[in-house]
Amino acid sequence: MTSALTQGLERIPDQLGYLVLSEGAVLASSGDLENDEQAASAISELVSTACGFRLHRGMNVPFKRLSVVFGEHTLLVTVSGQRVFVVKRQNRGREPIDV
């Protein structure tokens, strides 16, 4: 069952799973990230650390999106209000570039 909270996440191409967090608690999850409390904790800590960086004075939120790229997948993190949306996406293979 798709809720208003997750309907957009389920339509993301190459999506392998998602987490929706609020204050470190998992509100919704699916796929590879379903009920993954360890990932939720690590991502919450990462977001907290990233929020500590202030490149420009006066910014309310220091970032909107954060990408953590691994070999075969990427974690895409978006902060919206009090919620953190995390999507695990499959990285698409690329053809080698001839130089």
Swiss-Prot record:
Keywords for the protein's UniProt record, in alphabetical order: Acetylation, Lysosome, Phosphoprotein
PTM characteristics: Phosphorylation at Ser-67 by PKA inhibits Ragulator complex assembly.
InterPro entries for the chain: LAMTOR4 (IPR034601)
Main location group: other
Keyword hit for Transmembrane: no
Single GO biological process annotation from the record: TORC1 signaling
List of residues that carry N-acetylthreonine: T2
Modified residues (N-acetylmethionine): M1
GO CC annotation: FNIP-folliculin RagC/D GAP; intracellular membrane-bounded organelle; late endosome membrane; lysosomal membrane; lysosome; Ragulator complex
Modified residues (Phosphoserine): S67
Subcellular location: Lysosome
Coiled-coil region: none
Family to which the UniProt record says this protein belongs: Belongs to the LAMTOR4 family.
Subunit structure: Part of the Ragulator complex composed of LAMTOR1, LAMTOR2, LAMTOR3, LAMTOR4 and LAMTOR5. LAMTOR4 and LAMTOR5 form a heterodimer that interacts, through LAMTOR1, with a LAMTOR2, LAMTOR3 heterodimer. The Ragulator complex interacts with both the mTORC1 complex and heterodimers constituted of the Rag GTPases RagA/RRAGA, RagB/RRAGB, RagC/RRAGC and RagD/RRAGD; regulated by amino acid availability. The Ragulator complex interacts with SLC38A9; the probable amino acid sensor.
Protein function: As part of the Ragulator complex it is involved in amino acid sensing and activation of mTORC1, a signaling complex promoting cell growth in response to growth factors, energy levels, and amino acids. Activated by amino acids through a mechanism involving the lysosomal V-ATPase, the Ragulator plays a dual role for the small GTPases Rag (RagA/RRAGA, RagB/RRAGB, RagC/RRAGC and/or RagD/RRAGD): it (1) acts as a guanine nucleotide exchange factor (GEF), activating the small GTPases Rag and (2) mediates recruitment of Rag GTPases to the lysosome membrane.
Name of this protein: Ragulator complex protein LAMTOR4
